[in-house]
């Protein structure tokens, strides 16, 4: 777990600790559902809209870059956490799945082919199905008195004595959600964006929650 009220820039690479549990992994389902008709987070009827050519090209590149991560062993070898034993996140709005982070990718850059997190759905047989990716950028703020720049980890929003450095990022033409507080103690405020490239989301490819899937009971 994270601790403290501010998170030095030099320690951003250890942000994945709150997500990480290392145990044996299981094979994954490699057959994605069709996602060709899904265009944006605001498309409630995805089949009625299509992606533009540039976004389509970018998403195709993302799929090519992450296809190997249907195999959980390949994801772990690439630096992502082992999903075994991690919680499957759901709510009345839908499901996100199991979040696994690659700590080496956690910084201020948004690289479309290198998402900071992968989202897996646990399967009844004990395996995992890759359903989405997540981009995450910590919020950096500057102390106006000292000039120090840190990732903000306090529960509440920074006050007048600080200036937010990190502005809302975007990927595939979609602005990230946030800033939002960390989901675990000490996890920084951040921006995030889900992209459901490996499963259909009736709420849109870039929505936070997917109501068409559910965590196993």
Each model region followed by its residue ranges:
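N-terminal secretory signal peptides that target proteins for export/translocation
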Residues: 1-9
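Primary mode marks residue(s) on the alpha4-beta5-alpha5 output face of response regulator receiver
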Residues: 33-217
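C-terminal motif of bacterial Sec signal peptides marking the signal peptidase cleavage site
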Residues: 21-24
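Residue-level signal for mature regions of secreted extracellular proteins and peptides
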Residues: 18-19, 81
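Sec-dependent signal peptide recognition
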Residues: 10-15
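Bacterial signal peptide processing site
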Residues: 26-29
């Amino acid at each position: 777990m994270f601790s403290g009220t501010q998170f030095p820039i030099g320690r951003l690479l250890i942000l994945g600790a709150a997500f990480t549990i290392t145990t044996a992994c299981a094979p994954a389902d490699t057959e994605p559902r069709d996602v060709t008709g899904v265009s944006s987070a605001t498309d409630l009827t995805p089949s009625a809209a299509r992606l533009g050519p540039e976004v389509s090209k970018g998403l195709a590149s993302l799929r090519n870059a992450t296809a190997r991560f249907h195999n959980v062993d390949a994801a772990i070898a690439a630096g992502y956490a082992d999903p075994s034993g991690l919680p499957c996140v759901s709510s009345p709005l839908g499901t996100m799945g199991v979040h696994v982070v690659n700590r080496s990718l956690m910084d201020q850059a948004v690289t479309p082919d290198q998402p900071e997190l992968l989202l897996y759905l646990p399967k009844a047989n004990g395996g995992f199905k890759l359903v989405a990716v997540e981009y995450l950028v910590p919020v950096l703020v500057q102390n106006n008195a000292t000039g120090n720049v840190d990732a903000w980890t306090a529960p509440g929003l920074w006050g007048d004595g600080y200036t937010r450095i990190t502005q809302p990022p975007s990927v595939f033409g979609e602005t990230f959600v946030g800033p939002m507080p960390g989901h675990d103690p000490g996890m920084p405020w951040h921006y995030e964006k889900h992209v459901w490239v490996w499963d259909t989301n009736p709420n849109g490819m870039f929505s936070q929650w997917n109501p068409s899937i559910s965590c196993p009971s």
